[in-house]
Amino acid sequence: MKKRIKELTDLLNRYRYDYYTKDAPSVSDSDYDKLYRELVTLEQSYPEYVLQDSPTQQVGGTILKGFEKYRHQYPLFSLQDAFSREELDAFDKRVKAEFPNATYLAELKIDGLSISLSYENGFLQVGATRGDGNIGENITENIKKIKDIPHQLSEPLTITVRGEAYMSRQSFKAINEGRQENGETEFANPRNAAAGTLRQLDTAVVAKRQLATFLYQEVSPTARNQQNEVLAELADLGFSVNPYYQLTSSMDEIWDFIKTIEAKRDQLAYDIDGVVIKVNSLAMQEELGFTVKAPRWAIAYKFPAEEKEAEILSVDWTVGRTGVVTPTANLTPVQLAGTTVSRATLHNVDYIAEKDIRIGDTVIVYKAGDIIPAVLNVVMSKRNQQEVMLIPKLCPSCGSELVHFEDEVALRCINPLCPSLIQRSLEHFASRDAMNITGLGPAIVEKLFLAGFVHDVADIYQLTKEDFMQLDGIKEKSADKLLAAIEASKSNSAEKLLFGLGIRHIGSKVSRLILEVYGDISALLTAKEEEIARIDGLGSTIAQSLTQYFEQKTAAILVDELKTAGVNMHYSGQKVNSDAALFGLTVVLTGKLNQLNRNEAKDKLEALGAKVTGSVSKKTDLVIAGSDAGSKLEKAKSLGIRIEDEDWLRQL
């Protein structure tokens, strides 16, 4: 029986591969079902012989308790976006300046959810969401319910791959029809449906919804030399790989490919929102390297957003956490990119003036980045004596006079006691990317503020069960959960706290870069502007904003109150040594190294505090030149940049 179970498992897995990966079914559905039922019967009788990669392990359901955080061994970066041919040409120019013979691989940008799959000796161990690129969620049990993801590879490799999970248009339509019949809320679009499915706690639901995948990258080290070779290897290993891609050195041919794909976009069985262009050589990719946010060797061309006409009925003005007052248009409802849109941003007062937008105008509405509804411009041919929009002079929340600084495009409320400003600041502090206080959303924050329980973020840590119980709709169990979430947030790493403070220009990635150097929030109270500006990826604007914030007496008081409440001030990641020999220097490696390989040299430079980049520019501080160094060495000499050799590096 053990032998027969093995035969059936291998046979069914091959049929599944033919169907899902090669798109060439090699057996009828009835024959497949017959073999499948035989395997199920045998496995029930001999459970000790069930194999890890059995197709029966991908059906049925398990109720999960939740999803654990998962730290990616290899960070998953986002891509730089491009919206025009000019931006693609600029990318091409940057790459060709370093590598004149570079070729590109253009691939479809699938509109789904980015996933990471890790295998050990050929067996699937972990499936995770991208998250913020460093930390995602472990969704392995749900990943196993996606039929075209192999549980066992065709070779016993230890490998981590990246791809996109998506829902086909056909599956999306069928699911929404079922939800409509059952009186359930329909999904807005296939991407939202896929996202909701991957976060299901009932794995049977995941199996039923028939997600699919396309894999496109080996994020762990690979023996392949070219990206097109990586795609071929992924297909050989049993993954689904998108068949549409083009290899070329010509941006003209890339543009023709983009236009061809855009024209047939609606004929595909799944949603795409653009084309990704990658340098095909993996060695060139390594030399080009990364910015803080994205690889320098790839760019994502986004298709133009869908546009619709709508009428502006009224405008709401709201105050954000930094005091910026943002206008939002209320519109006649329109269907846009799979959702009903009745509100759209007008950005700021300068934008309204530039476009001459008025109440009652018919306007063109689109989704910026296919996400945020925005007003593009006015359909002037349909204007009929609409009145010029009145720009508020007073804050809609506190009544203070609004200011319009010369160097800004927005109106701003500068009253630190403005109720909306305080509430938005509290909401931001509790948000997922900041302190991640589960349950403490806008509605609860508003109730706490109006009840007088919170006036700044430190007050959150003084809240009691009795405080919550006084709020409408809060029962004892909810109060206990909120207090537990608040207590749990105290142990967050300090970069989440720094981001949560809502300092202008200090985002989540910048917060991490700052704490990698300073290590502790308290150290920022005495940090110097010029020191902060030296940190790789930052600059004078960020440095000025940070020092101005922490120079305020109120900042020192707030930090002290948070510390007294038990909130962690320390960065839990690996700290950068600001006293290191090469701290803050931008270094380029070029030529052949004899004693160190390139990764070893890069690791040593980064350990010494340097930022390693792939191109020489005026911003380069140092070039490490090996033998046969070419154009980069010559450029460094012409710019008067310091040049050292491998022996010098080894002696540091």
From Swiss-Prot:
Active-site residues per Swiss-Prot or TrEMBL entry: K109 (n6-amp-lysine intermediate)
rRNA-binding recorded as keyword: no
Q: Which residues form the BRCT domain?
A: 577-652
Sites binding Zn(2+) sit at: C395, C398, C413, C418
Entry-linked SMART domains? BRCT, HhH1, LIGANc
Question: According to its record, what are the GO cellular component terms?
Answer: cytosol
- Please list the GO biological process terms of this entry: DNA repair; DNA replication
Please give the superkingdom of this protein's source: Bacteria
Q: What is its EC number?
A: 6.5.1.2
Binding of NAD(+), residues? D29, S30, D31, Y32, D33, S78, L79, E107, R130, E164, K278, K302
Keywords assigned by UniProt?
DNA damage, DNA repair, DNA replication, Ligase, Magnesium, Manganese, Metal-binding, NAD, Zinc
Could you state a single Gene Ontology molecular function term?
Answer: DNA ligase (NAD+) activity
The protein's annotated catalytic reaction(s) are: NAD(+) + (deoxyribonucleotide)n-3'-hydroxyl + 5'-phospho-(deoxyribonucleotide)m = (deoxyribonucleotide)n+m + AMP + beta-nicotinamide D-nucleotide
Cofactor names from the entry are: Mg(2+); Mn(2+)
- Identify which top EC class this enzyme belongs to: ligase
| Gene3D superfamilies for this protein | 5' to 3' exonuclease, C-terminal subdomain, 6.20.10.30, BRCT domain, DNA ligase/mRNA capping enzyme, Helix hairpin bin, Nucleic acid-binding proteins
State the similarity comment. Belongs to the NAD-dependent DNA ligase family. LigA subfamily.
What the protein does comes down to: DNA ligase that catalyzes the formation of phosphodiester linkages between 5'-phosphoryl and 3'-hydroxyl groups in double-stranded DNA using NAD as a coenzyme and as the energy source for the reaction. It is essential for DNA replication and repair of damaged DNA.
Task: Give the protein name, as stated in the record.
Answer: DNA ligase
Q: Which gene encodes it?
A: ligA
